[in-house]
Each structure stands twice: as C-alpha cells, then as structure tokens.
C-alpha cells in the first residue's frame, strides 16, 4: 500500500516536506527553488506556512519533477551530495548548458530529468 493511500496521510504535506528536503540536499537557495517552481519567494514561504503543496497544481507538478531529478542524481552519485551539487552547477556539454540554469524553464527541467533518466538506463 502506498503511503499516500493510508488514512490520515496528507499528500499536500508529504509533497511539501519532500520538496524542502530536496532543496536542502541539493543546496538550493530559496530563490533558486522559487525560480524552478515558477513562483516568487513569498509565495513559497506562504505554502510552507499553509502546510502543503497540491500535487495536482502546476507548482506541484514542477515540484514532482524536481524531486524526480533529485532521486536520479542520488542513484547516479550514490548519495554523494557534493557530486550531486557539482553536477547541477557545472557546464554540461550534453545538455549544452548548466543544468540548474536550464531548470528555471519547464522544458529545461524536463530535459534535465530525461537526460538523468537516460544515463541511468531507465
């Protein structure tokens, strides 16, 4: 049984907690996270105060993609946070740019996730 299918589990709170953990692990600033999600920093803070982020919302879908990128990086680098952060902030010739900068646009975020999935062999 999925954790989200259990009674009493709030999917909005679970997504927000996973997103904030992802931000911390990847060493993203609040401004960088807000840029990826397409919201301003104040809106991001309000979501934290409200206790959740709807998975079905546009922001929620972008958050799920970012979490997917984190999980792919974790698998590729064996959980080495320094290497994961280096990947995001370094020029990548296959992606023709810096992944973190590309992730500020939806198509860039999708491209980075697809690239990570491809090199993992998924």
What are these regions (language model features)?
Residues 1-122:
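Non-transmembrane "mature" sequence context
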């Amino acid at each position: 049984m999925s954790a989200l299918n259990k009674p009493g589990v709030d999917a909005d709170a679970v997504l927000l907690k996973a997103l904030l953990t992802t931000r911390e692990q990847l060493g993203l600033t609040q401004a960088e996270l807000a840029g990826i999600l397409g919201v301003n920093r104040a809106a991001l803070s309000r979501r934290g105060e409200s206790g959740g982020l709807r998975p079905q919302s546009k922001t929620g879908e972008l958050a799920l993609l970012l979490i997917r990128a984190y999980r792919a990086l974790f698998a590729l680098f064996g959980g080495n946070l320094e290497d994961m952060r280096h990947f995001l902030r370094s020029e990548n010739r296959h992606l023709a740019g810096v992944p973190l900068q590309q992730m500020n646009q939806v198509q860039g975020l999708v491209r980075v996730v697809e690239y990570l999935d491809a090199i993992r062999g998924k």
